[in-house]
């Protein structure tokens, strides 16, 4: 597929970045993330309206993640020869359809169908996001373009829940999803206007997705991705009980800590391109090492509110390097099969998020308050060591 990519990255694409297309992709990603997490702040009215429990309504988030994991694995096999411009438009249509189905849902089954449509769009879009980016900008600009996309993710993660809750009180949960559908329509038009034709992979160049794992350093990279994201979710999923019981934060104080984390994450994402230009491997090894030290500091001295707040800020700044860094690794080291590598990466991250949260919860309930921190720190340290020893990196 290397010849395919080279042939289809025209002279303009190589020398001049298409920022309008990059920002349209970033906006689409932000909309997907916002819609993914809208139910978190709307569970109570959704459950009451549909006559189900909040726990059952919460499965609308679970089904999205579950479908996204499988969609990410198989989407590139399905769309091999299709122009990626039409594929992205299809994902934006699925986003819009999902919002409308949820808005008009009169049963739990229809709600799940709507959320499954979102999962298809979410998993598919993430699977091809890295390869899309590398076909829209010159190679040296890829980290900057990825930082724009992940910056949009950071903003979406910060505003999704509070925005959904605020608007839900004003206009009702169904109209919140109607408004999200309007964002989906805007995505469709922006993509049609800005995204150029991006031919798919010719049939004679098809390759089994999982054969990529046989390449030197790729399996190590995917294991490192798994451990870093599992470590993140082992800690961050339980930041509320840890910070409220260990450091003594109240609800208002915790809100400020989470806001500080979100702002730091956005800043870290914005600065990531400058760091990754110097050394991707150093960033991918250094970031989890700093996080391992942060987990140790919080375990030992987390009862001090200043220390705990500082760790949250450092964590947000540092972890922001990891998703951008691994996407950059794919665009450089697996450029000839970036879509398939992206598919595996998304599935690994979804699995890691689930496992990290589950094991962290078990540790919290059965070992002690700081056990999620120790688990997270151990996984981050192992990630740093694995990246240093085994992960291969090609220069841009």
From Swiss-Prot:
**Catalytic activity line of the entry:** inosine(in) + H(+)(out) = inosine(out) + H(+)(in); guanosine(in) + H(+)(out) = guanosine(out) + H(+)(in)
Q: Which Pfam families match?
A: MFS_1
User: Record's family?
Assistant: Belongs to the major facilitator superfamily. DHA1 family. NepI (TC 2.A.1.2.26) subfamily.
* Record topological domains on the Periplasmic side: 43-54, 107, 169-175, 237-255, 303-305, 365-366
| Protein name according to UniProt | Purine ribonucleoside efflux pump NepI
Query: How would you describe this protein's topology in the membrane?
Result: Multi-pass membrane protein
Localization per Swiss-Prot or TrEMBL: Cell inner membrane
UniProt keywords (A-Z) are: Antiport, Cell inner membrane, Cell membrane, Membrane, Transmembrane, Transmembrane helix, Transport
Q: Cite the GO molecular-function annotations of the record.
A: antiporter activity; purine nucleoside transmembrane transporter activity
Name the GO cellular-component terms.
plasma membrane
Cytoplasmic topological intervals: 1-21, 76-85, 129-147, 197-215, 277-281, 327-343, 388-396
Outline what the protein does.
Involved in the efflux of purine ribonucleosides, such as inosine and guanosine.
- Highest rank taxon of the organism: Bacteria
Q: Which residues cross the membrane?
A: 22-42, 55-75, 86-106, 108-128, 148-168, 176-196, 216-236, 256-276, 282-302, 306-326, 344-364, 367-387
UniProt xrefs under SUPFAM superfamilies: MFS general substrate transporter (SSF103473)
According to the UniProt entry, where is the signal peptide? none
